Amino acid sequence: MILIAGPCVIESQEMLRKIASELQPLSEDARIDFYFKASFDKANRTSLESYRGPGLEKGLEMLGRIKEEFGYKLLTDIHETQQVAKAAQVVDILQIPAFLCRQTDLIVEAAKSQSIVNIKKGQFMNPADMSHSVLKAIKTRGGSEASYEEAKRLGIWLTERGSSFGYGNLVVDMRSLMIMRQFAPVIFDATHAVQMPGAAGGKSGGDSRFVAPLSRAAAAVGVDGFFTETHVSPKEALSDGPNMITPQALKVLVHQLLALSEI
């Protein structure tokens, strides 16, 4: 089972290391293909005043230290084509943010790297239409069709993170997991699926109570892995605190997901 876990954004080297240390038992489980994640820049924050992160250069340096100390494989998201080359030197997965999932130049540039490309499904997207985004990456890597086998072979993944449900709310249509899994390995991101975009007055809200049940539901439907943002103190997190769960809660959840995956 693939597990991508870590904080929403890089806050400090000390906090990054603290969270990474808490996740070490999960990384050592032979049943888990573990990736540590964190963003160097949250480029689509609701408010101009919201914390965005340390930026590309410093952020990659900080992630590199985590890789060196813990031996973790890494994921970070990119927003512009010129970020790809530098990010690909440090991380193992380049993530295309949901709002940018149709951006051809960004997908193609990411696919030119040696990193896995994880494309997050836009909240506004029909899951079936994500095959076009997948095919952009597949063709860039010399493939010819959007199929699960081809995408897996070429390292192209999709992530489900909920769909817009009116203003300031998201809902998960579990059918999308089956639909998208026809043409790519699928990761389920429950922590962003429980987000309430822009609902907290200049920033997004959320309800982390639903992270575990939605994750278990996705495991029952069938997915290739899970993306879960975690923080030692979600209430004090500088971004997406209401959606995140603690490392302790994540450990409990992962054992449940492993059990469900074996059914």
UniProtKB/Swiss-Prot annotation:
Gene Ontology terms describing biological process: keto-3-deoxy-D-manno-octulosonic acid biosynthetic process
Top EC class, one word: transferase
Domain of life: Bacteria
GO molecular function list: 3-deoxy-8-phosphooctulonate synthase activity
The EC number(s) this enzyme carries: 2.5.1.55
GO cellular component, one term: cytoplasm
Pathway linked to the protein: Carbohydrate biosynthesis; 3-deoxy-D-manno-octulosonate biosynthesis; 3-deoxy-D-manno-octulosonate from D-ribulose 5-phosphate: step 2/3; Bacterial outer membrane biogenesis; lipopolysaccharide biosynthesis
Pfam family, one: DAHP_synth_1
Keyword Transmembrane set for record: no
Catalytic activity: D-arabinose 5-phosphate + phosphoenolpyruvate + H2O = 3-deoxy-alpha-D-manno-2-octulosonate-8-phosphate + phosphate
Keywords: Cytoplasm, Lipopolysaccharide biosynthesis, Transferase
Family named by the database record: Belongs to the KdsA family.
Protein name: 2-dehydro-3-deoxyphosphooctonate aldolase
Organism expressing this protein natively: Wolinella succinogenes (strain ATCC 29543 / DSM 1740 / CCUG 13145 / JCM 31913 / LMG 7466 / NCTC 11488 / FDC 602W) (Vibrio succinogenes)
Gene: kdsA
